[in-house]
């Protein structure tokens, strides 16, 4: 099955939140996720976006994400922090995580 890696869009945030919740369940912290789809949209797409997100998509389904945000290093200047890299369990082992990480490295 082929996948594409692309910049996330506002209408992807429902799927992004679902993957965040899947990660929290894996980490045995499902009740710790309090962010909402609306908050992700507000924080990622309006004013000064607080994060950048790439998605992996198979047949119009978001199956992975890389979520990153800017930070500043006193030694190196502008940098990006990779907060989460998540691939849904069903699609692991197909190189999707590596492709998302590679997109992050190439972009920043």
Say what each PLM segment does.
Residues 4-16:
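A short beta-loop-alpha structural element at the N-terminal edge
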Residues 8, 85-87:
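Hydrophobic adenine-recognition pocket in adenosine-nucleotide-binding enzymes
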Residues 15-22, 39, 99, 103:
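Alpha-helical elements of Rossmann-like donor-binding domains used by nucleotide-donor carbohydrate transfer enzymes
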Residues 20-43:
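Conserved GNAT-fold acetyl-CoA-binding loop/helix
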Residues 44-55:
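A short helix-loop-beta-strand connector motif used in the catalytic cores of GNAT acetyltransferases and
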Residues 55, 61-69:
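Conserved beta-strand in the GNAT
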Residues 72-82, 92:
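A conserved beta-turn-beta hairpin within the catalytic core of GNAT-like acetyltransferases
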Residues 87, 93-106:
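Conserved acetyl-CoA-binding loop-helix of GNAT-fold acetyltransferases
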């Amino acid at each position: 099955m082929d996948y594409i890696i692309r910049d996330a869009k506002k209408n992807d945030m429902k799927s992004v939140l679902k993957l965040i919740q899947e990660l929290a369940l894996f980490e045995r912290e499902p009740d710790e996720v309090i962010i909402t789809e609306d908050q992700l949209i507000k924080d990622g797409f309006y004013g000064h976006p607080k994060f950048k997100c790439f998605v992996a998509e198979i047949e119009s389904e978001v199956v992975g994400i890389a979520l990153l945000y800017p930070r500043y290093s006193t030694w190196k200047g502008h940098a990006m922090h990779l907060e989460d890299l998540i691939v849904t369990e069903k699609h692991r082992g197909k190189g999707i995580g590596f492709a998302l990480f590679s997109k992050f490295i190439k972009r920043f």
